[in-house]
């Protein structure tokens, strides 16, 4: 179906151009006609007073955790996980995750997010909710090698791939989701790696989120989490690493060499007192860095505009450089760079031939 969005302000490459039009052919941007005729299109949207922007990409979240919003505040990560979140998650089921996910998608779509990358449990229910909501998603079943459900969880993730990869007219992709080095011992990481390699499935993992995680990894293995995962061959697969707060220069060099993409979660890292990821240093080294909210319980909202603002402000303060991350760069992290993080080269930008994931922002 052909669609015309007319009379809009157009945000592209950090600039706004007024009185523009966008022509769509199905799910793709066709062109930007100067004098379009309404009768040439099956659908016409008058965008007067609106600003057209690429849809925002939330590169790391746990959508059903909307149900745990404000449940556990003023705690550091491991205390928060072990004493609040993991016990609460034992009570989840398919129906609860479906409605928790649907609540998240309502919040995301209202806030301009059109794509998300999720790692959680009961992911078939999350996928069904996302399909009904019409949002784009990368899905991973969170895997814990130390859990009694380690093998059944991995099988669930493989079945998720078989059912949902490419579904929803290409809106859904599936990743394998080993939770973190502290929940996934080396032998389990190797098993996940091997299963992913057999099927060409990318990886979504939490890495170097807290100082304690890195210290414990060094104590147990003599390596940082990044170096450990690299030595285990995990980075031979396309990998999205969430957080990467406490990383060394050597870690960053490995990530750049292995094309590991990073989901930067400033709000979550601040709330859980995890620290501030060296986002500026990683970007300067050539690492692709997107933005994520993490789950609503570790952020309290799924607002990507808020994450853009935080990302820009905390790095200005942390580096004493007002140009550390500009507004334009923060927008890139939330759109085109976020799209690259989840495996898209034709998303997060308003260009001919790009996917037409477009939001209209009311400027009145």
Q: What would you call each of these model-derived segments?
A:
Residues 125-245:
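Metal-coordinating catalytic core of metallo-dependent amide/deamination hydrolases
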Residues 231-234, 238, 280-363:
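His/Asp/Glu-enriched, well-ordered alpha-helical/loop segment
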Residues 8, 22, 27, 49, ...:
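Divalent metal-coordination and catalytic microenvironments
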């Amino acid at each position: 179906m052909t669609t015309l969005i007319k009379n809009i302000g157009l945000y592209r490459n950090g600039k706004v151009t007024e009185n523009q039009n966008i022509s769509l052919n199905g799910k793709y941007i066709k062109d930007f006609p100067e004098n379009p005729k309404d009768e040439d299109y099956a659908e016409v949207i008058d965008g007067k007073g609106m600003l057209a922007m690429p849809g925002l990409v939330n590169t790391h979240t746990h959508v059903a955790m909307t149900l745990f919003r404000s449940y556990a505040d003023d705690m550091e990560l491991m205390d928060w996980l072990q004493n609040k979140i993991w016990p609460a998650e034992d009570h989840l089921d398919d129906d609860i995750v479906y409605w928790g996910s649907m609540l998240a998608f309502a919040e995301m779509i209202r806030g301009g997010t059109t794509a998300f990358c999720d790692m959680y449990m009961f992911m078939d229910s999350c996928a069904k909710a996302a399909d009904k909501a019409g949002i784009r998603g990368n899905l991973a079943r969170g895997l814990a090698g130390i859990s009694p459900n380690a093998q059944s969880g991995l099988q669930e993730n493989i079945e998720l791939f078989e059912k949902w990869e490419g579904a929803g007219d290409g809106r859904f992709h599936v990743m394998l989701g080993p939770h973190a080095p502290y929940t996934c011992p080396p032998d389990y990481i190797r098993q996940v790696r091997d299963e992913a390699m057999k099927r060409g499935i990318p990886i979504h993992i939490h890495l170097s989120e807290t100082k304690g995680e890195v210290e414990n990894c060094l104590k147990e293995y003599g390596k940082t989490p990044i170096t450990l995962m690299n030595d285990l061959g995990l980075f031979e697969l396309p990998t999205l690493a969430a957080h990467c707060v406490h990383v060394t220069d050597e870690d960053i060099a490995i990530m750049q060499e292995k094309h590991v993409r990073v989901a930067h979660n400033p709000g979550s890292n601040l709330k859980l007192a995890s620290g501030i990821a060296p986002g500026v240093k990683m970007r300067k080294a050539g690492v692709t860095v997107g933005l994520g909210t993490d789950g609503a319980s570790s952020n309290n909202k799924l607002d990507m505009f808020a994450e853009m603002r935080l990302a820009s402000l905390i790095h200005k303060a942390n580096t004493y450089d007002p140009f550390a991350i500009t507004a334009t760069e923060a927008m890139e992290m939330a759109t085109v760079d976020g799209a690259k993080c989840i495996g898209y080269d034709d998303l997060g930008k308003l260009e001919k031939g790009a996917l037409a994931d477009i939001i209209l922002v009311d400027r009145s």
